[in-house]
Amino acid sequence: MMSLWIAIGALSTLALVSGVVLGFAARRFQVDEDPVVEQVDAILPQSQCGQCGYPGCRPYAEAVSTGGEKINKCAPGGEQVMLKLAELLAVEPQPLDGDESAAHPQRKVAFIDEANCIGCTKCIQACPVDAIIGATRAMHTVLSDLCTGCDLCVAPCPTDCIEMIPVATTTANWKWDLNTIPVKNLPN
């Protein structure tokens, strides 16, 4: 019976010492997150398209929040995202990179001409949001609800059977973005 109490005491002491060491290590080696990075990342559209030159929205948010990158590189977000970033970071709004269509982007989705698709899966590998389904040597198709219109699947296609088509605005997909409407507080 005594050996049972010794074992319980030894394991309890070991657990207590391990907890103290892990607690100290967690505090000592804690990585502090920059709250500005989190706020910038929340504003970005999270399409992970790479059109800004970064592999995703989080790396672009880190580059913008450190002050080294321009706020006008997010093509899917358009002018709305750029204005929100300018307000958050207290910098001057900048014209968007690209042509005039970048200021007011039109939602587009990928369309695969299935008759010409050879099933090489290069578009599936390029899609950052897994919006393309299919198998090797079989037809592929795009799930338009998941497609962000990033255009990354078009270039790898060896048969040029993928094109970006604009999505018609209907009552089912139209969203009134109330955050873009300027609101002024009137004095009493």
Swiss-Prot record:
Origin: domain of life: Bacteria
Free-text comment on the cofactor: Binds 3 [4Fe-4S] clusters.
One of the record's GO cellular component terms: plasma membrane
EC number(s) from the headed UniProt entry: 7.-.-.-
Binding positions ([4Fe-4S] cluster 3): 127, 147, 150, 153
NCBIfam families referenced in this protein's UniProt entry, alphabetically: PRK05113.1, rnfB
Protein's name according to its UniProt entry: Ion-translocating oxidoreductase complex subunit B
Originating gene: rnfB
